[in-house]
Amino acid sequence: MGSIEQTTEILLCLSPVEVASLKEGINFFRNKSTGKDYILYKNKSRLRACKNMCKHQGGLFIKDIEDLAGRSVRCTKHNWKLDVSTMKYINPPESFCQDELVVEMDENNRLLLLELNPPNPWDLQPRSPEELAFGEVQITYLTHACMDLKLGDKRMVFDPWLIGPAFARGWWLLHEPPSDWLERLCQADLIYISHLHSDHLSYPTLKKLAGRRPDIPIYVGNTERPVFWNLNQSGVQLTNINVVPFGIWQQVDKNLRFMILMDGVHPEMDTCIIVEYKGHKILNTVDCTRPNGGRLPMKVALMMSDFAGGASGFPMTFSGGKFTEEWKAQFIKTERKKLLNYKARLVKNLQPRIYCPFAGYFVESHPSDKYIKETNTKNDPNELNNLIKKNSDVITWTPRPGATLDLGRMLKDPTDSKGIIEPPEGTKIYKDSWDFEPYLEILNAAVGDEIFLHSSWIKEYFTWAGFKDYNLVVRMIETDEDFNPFPGGYDYLVDFLDLSFPKERPQREHPYEEIHSRVDVIRHVVKNGLLWDELYIGFQTRLQRDPDIYHHLFWNHFQIKLPLTPPNWKSFLMCCEQNGPGILQECKTT
């Protein structure tokens, strides 16, 4: 259709000297090579930025001398005023929000202002909304982040996780999916999978689907780490996976198209989607923290997003220092409230006709995770919806498994009793039992694997992982289910500065972390070359760190940047066999 894939554009680059010279409050800059103007607002360590261009008629902003707080700028054309600390126009009030630019520091301590180009790709080839017949567009909630969309004579499914756990054994479904879920998947014309996390890319679910429809079209974004990077290892036979570029309409038929967008301005892992049918847009931001670099379409017909929080091991799995139970409880309460308010503000700003909170309906149901379940409180979708309704006219929908929203009816008359059809009375909503054993058996199979008879697996694995030249020492301790040392398990140090494995901590000054991991999960992860989200997001570790610093480079590497193929354990074992038996045998494959 003549569209061009979105790219990340550097609008302005400030040197370390210029960064050090930034003053508190408003800073004006011009890119001398392009002649474009920008505003940077500094509040202690926080930076916000935007183009120096009024949204009204493109006028230039200057300092507002009437603003003693030093937060607002004034347009030279019509005296419109923008509060740069909030990116909201204050004169006239409640008029616009200024589009914000992404601020990043690069490896050379330069400050970059970034934007996706084109920034609003959905505006290309625009379509005017047509009237929808009743029943023409129906959205049925299945469970967690899985929606079944009927769009005319086509069916589309989002993120099918319908059976089994996610993140090793840490997450289980809160809601009981409709009994016909597999039939619904098989009848779909296409499936969208937002990202590689196992509560969205569920291989147990896809294995069931592949047994009946291995050629079902599945669409994913062109992320740096492929969504299906582990397909061959999974053993699931899917033959029609389509990787599509970001920001380009994908035409399904004359009435239906969709566009996949990245999270932030770098296509690392997460994506979101706009589905458009007869000009009516459905926006699903899934788990994105800054979808499309913060630019999203306004006044869509239906918006859905995550809401719950709790999708991280922090702070529940941490101990020592400040991590008392009281501190954790207060932190969790504060963070959940911040997330709730952020989602409510986002919905208020975007003004969709209808909003649906989803993608947060999981529970830590295995008995061994009782502490996590009790500590890791989630947001209540009804509380969010009530907050939204207080501040806007947006219609809200808290979905239950099998409930169906008729978009045509709801857009015409939100009070129509047939606009949302709830599941039949007596339908089971919440799961009360989970089939743990088959999935735990898969994990337990790794514990006795021959690989772990040779202590040299440690060097082999971390060499394969490829993370080094970073001043961090980590102690890895294998544990039982209750995080007590596993009898006969490994307890070792890794020094990532030179990728060595010392018997004692080095004498130099160094940050230090202790990671206690359930033996079945860590060995399953090591054996199969899986990402450490299985451990961290799955609550399969207990951590201590000194000092209390988050080592982004370390965790980002093990959560997203590990090699795409697992370690060559076959070659490793052959080497060990050739060099003779012995649990302490040192081996290195070539």
Swiss-Prot record:
It is found in: Cytoplasm. Its main location: cytoplasm. Keywords: 2Fe-2S, Cytoplasm, Electron transport, Iron, Iron-sulfur, Metal-binding, Oxidoreductase, Transport. One of its GO terms (biological process) is CMP-N-acetylneuraminate metabolic process. Binds 1 [2Fe-2S] cluster per subunit. The keyword Metal-binding applies. Sialic acids are components of carbohydrate chains of glycoconjugates and are involved in cell-cell recognition and cell-pathogen interactions. Catalyzes the conversion of CMP-N-acetylneuraminic acid (CMP-Neu5Ac) into its hydroxylated derivative CMP-N-glycolylneuraminic acid (CMP-Neu5Gc), a sialic acid abundantly expressed at the surface of many cells. Belongs to the CMP-Neu5Ac hydroxylase family. This is Cytidine monophosphate-N-acetylneuraminic acid hydroxylase. It comes from Pan troglodytes (Chimpanzee). The lineage of its organism: Eukaryota, Metazoa, Chordata, Craniata, Vertebrata.
